[in-house]
């Protein structure tokens, strides 16, 4: 009898890690979906693109494989699953043009049942918000537009068109031929700062920040080789990470960094920290307007700070380097395949589901 009890206890212990692992999963993209299964009967297959604080909660932008288009999902504190706001947006790849996008949509029409041709004028390259209202950028035509939920579904409202699109490119010189090549750059982050849209644009060395005036589409830039990252802050300000000293690849991984607040309105910078080691440099972060603090991602650990000198470990996520957004009570983290929610106060994982919806 005692041996049997020990055997049962051992089996329970073996099963415990699996149960805990399942509890840590908010959404995971299913694997090995049978291609013969009709699209409307397949499980929801999403590739998570981004998360942003908006509409009193957070909005997750995801590419829905079943419908070959972008969908928006909403979650706020107290909800037990994410609600689909709508979909049907075209996801702009960095090399897309209106012509190639049209060809891609025509191909989707030939393979996806009930595929609806998207509005390519309002295709989405990046999505962000001012904390409440959603803003999207279409890099194919430079259009910046708002997205809002109405009784009739999601509606778009044009804001402005960028005065030129060359600022979203990157150039490099071939040392052997001395030729200069230009191609579309990766856009790593986007934030609304008052009447300005700030876009972080990857360059051959480091980054630059493109500032678009939302009233008329005019552009100015923050550009120098030491600039390494841009994150959101309060009251029309950005956080800028800069590399101290040489900008070669060795110093990027072993050097030190400065952190400053940048006023979009005045161009003034306020130095916050110097000599920050590479391992303590932010991988991703989010401003918390509810506590006037900043949450910083350090691989799997989330730390909170108010002065960028002292830090308080808050929670951990099961995946590394998630992108995060905050609500009043929670931190929401996403990567390519998953969505997680942690309580700010207790650090517990909330298991949610994404509502399925046709179309």
Model-derived features with residue positions:
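An edge-strand/N-cap motif at the start of beta-rich repeat modules
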Residues: 21-65, 72-74, 78-80
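Short beta-strand elements that form the blades of beta-propeller/WD-repeat-like
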Residues: 49-64, 90, 98-103, 125-128, ...
């Amino acid at each position: 009898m005692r041996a049997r009890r020990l055997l049962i206890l051992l089996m329970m212990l073996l099963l415990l890690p699996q149960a805990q692992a399942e509890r840590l999963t908010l959404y995971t993209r299913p694997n090995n979906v049978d291609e013969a299964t009709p699209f409307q009967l397949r499980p929801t297959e999403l590739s998570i693109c981004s998360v942003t604080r908006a509409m009193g909660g957070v909005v997750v932008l995801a590419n829905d494989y079943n419908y070959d288009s972008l969908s928006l999902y909403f979650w706020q504190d107290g909800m037990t699953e994410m609600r689909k706001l709508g979909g049907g947006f075209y996801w702009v790849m960095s090399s897309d043009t209106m012509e190639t996008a049209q060809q891609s949509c025509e191909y989707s029409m030939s393979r996806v049942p009930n595929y609806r041709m998207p509005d390519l004028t309002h295709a989405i390259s990046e999505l962000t918000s001012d904390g409440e209202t959603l803003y999207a950028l279409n890099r194919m035509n430079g259009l910046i537009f708002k997205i809002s939920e109405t009784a009739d579904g999601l509606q778009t409202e044009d804001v402005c068109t960028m005065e030129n699109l060359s600022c979203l490119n990157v150039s490099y010189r071939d040392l052997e031929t001395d030729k200069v090549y230009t191609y579309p750059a990766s856009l790593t982050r986007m934030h609304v700062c008052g009447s300005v849209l700030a876009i972080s644009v990857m360059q051959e060395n480091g980054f630059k920040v493109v500032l678009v005036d939302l009233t008329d589409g005019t552009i100015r830039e923050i550009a120098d080789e030491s600039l390494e990252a841009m994150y959101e802050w309060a009251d029309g300000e950005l956080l800028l990470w800069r590399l101290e000293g040489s900008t070669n690849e060795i110093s990027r991984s072993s050097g030190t960094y400065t952190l400053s607040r940048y006023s979009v309105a005045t161009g003034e910078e306020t130095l916050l920290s110097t000599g920050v080691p590479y391992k303590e440099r932010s991988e991703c972060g989010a401003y918390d307007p509810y506590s006037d603090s900043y949450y910083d991602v350090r691989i799997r650990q989330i730390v909170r700070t108010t002065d960028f000198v002292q830090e308080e470990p808050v929670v951990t996520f099961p995946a590394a380097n998630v992108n995060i957004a905050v609500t009043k009570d929670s931190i929401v983290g996403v990567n390519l395949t998953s969505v997680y929610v942690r309580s700010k106060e207790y650090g517990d994982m909330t298991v949610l589901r994404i509502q399925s919806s046709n179309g």
